[in-house]
Amino acid sequence: LPAAVVRSVMKTLDRLQWRVTKKAEDAQRRELGLPRATSPAPRRITASGALEIQAYEQLCFPGLADEWKEWERQRPFVGTLTMELMTDADEQVASWIAAGTPPICFGFGSTAVKSPTDTVAMISAACAQLGERALICSGWSDFSDVTHPDHVNVVGPVNYATVFPSCRAVVHHSGAGTTAAGLRAGVPTLSLWSTGDQRIWATQVKRLKVGTARPFTATNRDTLIEDLRLILSPEYVARAREIATQMTKPAESIAKTADLLETFALQRRSA
């Protein structure tokens, strides 16, 4: 699409999202002693000359850093930010993984599936056909009452930073953070996207040749088997390991971000 059209669409989306969040934002600004906002946050950020930290990997969007060269100080790339927080399920998951062959991890994050029962049945059947184990991380969907066979383990939130590297592959909704965790883990990815922003990251997974992607609504038992066979092939496994070596380390991303924020704050204070 022409750049002018893209900008117009994004401005419209920003305003629509602002209408959804405006009430909460106004309340927060009152608590901080700030006046009510009169425009969407992206417009205010740009107009004020604020620091626009790019918290994702440059390799996902080659050429963008060069395109933004004149704004390099305002739009620095730091890599993906993650807190790598431990969860209550981590110990049990680690024990289950160690008790058998490395599983395929399925995570849906903020995407709520319409039928948890059908989804678990589809995953169970596909993995049984391939002779694989499945670790299903429920995210915002409730899988608590769904029965499943022995080769499947259903859990709540887990620490992707420790779980993903222990798996054969990861299958997820293609959220920005989950995609980055998969790339850092060095295992192949199957992106089953649902929304426009998820499709952006799914496209990068395919472009980097670390996996494949399709809409979640177009996924069934047969397509899942086909896609898993593809990403478990040696070339995708090798490529995923290669890309992992090019990712920023979590500690480096956090340190760089903190330094940038401190420097920017000091500059604004002394201006």
What are these regions (language model features)?
Residues 50, 75, 151-153, 211:
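Short, conserved active-site loop motifs that form the nucleotide-linked donor/cofactor pocket
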Residues 221-271:
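C-terminal amphipathic helix plus adjacent low-complexity
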Residues 131, 138-160:
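Nucleotide-activated donor-binding/catalytic signature segment of Leloir-type glycosyltransferases, i.e.
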Residues 64-65, 142-145, 197-202:
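Short, glycine/polar-rich helix-capping loops at beta-to-alpha or helix-loop-helix junctions
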Residues 1-103, 109-132, 146, 259:
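Nucleotide-sugar-dependent glycosyltransferase catalytic domains
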Residues 155-203:
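A donor-sugar binding/catalytic signature common to diverse glycosyltransferases
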